[in-house]
Amino acid sequence: CTLMNMNYQATLKSKAQHIRDCITRIGGADDVLRAMHGMEKPYAYRNRVQFPVGGKAGAPKVGFYKGNTHDVIDLPDGCMLLKPELNHARAIFAAWLRDSNLAPYDERTHRGIVRHAVFRVSRTGALMAIIVVNGSKLPGYEGLFRALERVGCVSLVLNELTDAPGSRRNTEIFGKKFVTLCGKERYMDEILGCQFELSAPSFF
């Protein structure tokens, strides 16, 4: 997003120069980077997103952090880089969270429930939703799953990430415990004819 004010070819040159500088500075190698090839349509391609949750009960913000802060900027119109299913999932989740009146987690007071929503979508349109909470429960999750099924959700997973009272700000996205609330424990994706079964914590 920080490069969206530049045209696409300029962003490719900027990224290539950054990589070239790192290879030279860290690896001590010069002239090893080949030409960078861009996409025909550099939008709506990202298949995974994590949305921090802010605001208050009844008026949540579901979006991204403002630069160099943990202040959540709401994203009602979605993100141009995300696949459409992810923007639809964000809107459904935000509406459900507002209507459920659940409190977003507050890093300063260590109170509230919902911390993050992470969505992943496969090339076939199968969606996995991972809701990160403070504690071990997500009241009303059945209604959320039914709503997300309209955009292809096949799995709703709860992740527990709880801070100890008096602890410093936790910058992690996931805790260690994942619990499948509805649907499948894994979903399928495919690359170059190879199929993969993916669980919530997998890196793909």
Question: Where in the sequence are the language-model features?
Answer:
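Accessory RNA-recognition modules of RNA-modification enzymes
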Residues: 2-204
